Amino acid sequence: MTHSEKLARETMKSRFKKTPILLVLAGMLLPSLALAQDDLNGANTAWILTSTALVRFMTLPGLSLFYGGLVRTKNVLSVLMQCFAIAVVISILWLLVGYSIAFGPSESAYWGGLSRALFAGIDINSMSGDIPETVFAAFQMTFAIITPALIVGAWVERIKFSSMLLFCTLWTLFVYFPVANWVWGGGWLGQMGLIDFAGGTVVHVTAGVGALVTA
């Protein structure tokens, strides 16, 4: 038997040894997947995941490069860092309390409460309609990121980095999250029949007013 044949045989043996382990791991995952499979719509889930990526690309790098091209050369890096920092800070804020305030199961018509803070009560089987709730939360997070980033154009070249972070954090916490609940989270505006398919109210009106006030 040649050396190559021995090597091939040893490789096959090692693969067969790993097969039972892989089967056990797959068996552990099957029950949880089966529980979520009944209500899961694969096409809708795939589309929301695609949309999540597209909205994220609107901010990073889309919006950051757009604003970077409108300023003087010495301020390009500052604008890019502002957009990237907003994405990081708002992502953390969304995980901590943002999703809960915007989409928590509260009886209040003005905010969602804190029952979903740190994604409490959300697991692999949690559903939002016919898609996983984690996918829905990720999709909505991209809107929470791009909204304060839109305001950057109002103060570009005229604000400290630390002041920008503080304003965006407080503005998102006290303006964006509640308004998202009012419209998309079953709040009082939604109950009155307001329909916002693409963020015209939640994103653009709030960001526009915020930019006008801070300009």
For each of these PLM feature ranges, what is it?
Residues H3-A215:
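Hydrophobic alpha-helical transmembrane bundles of multi-pass membrane proteins
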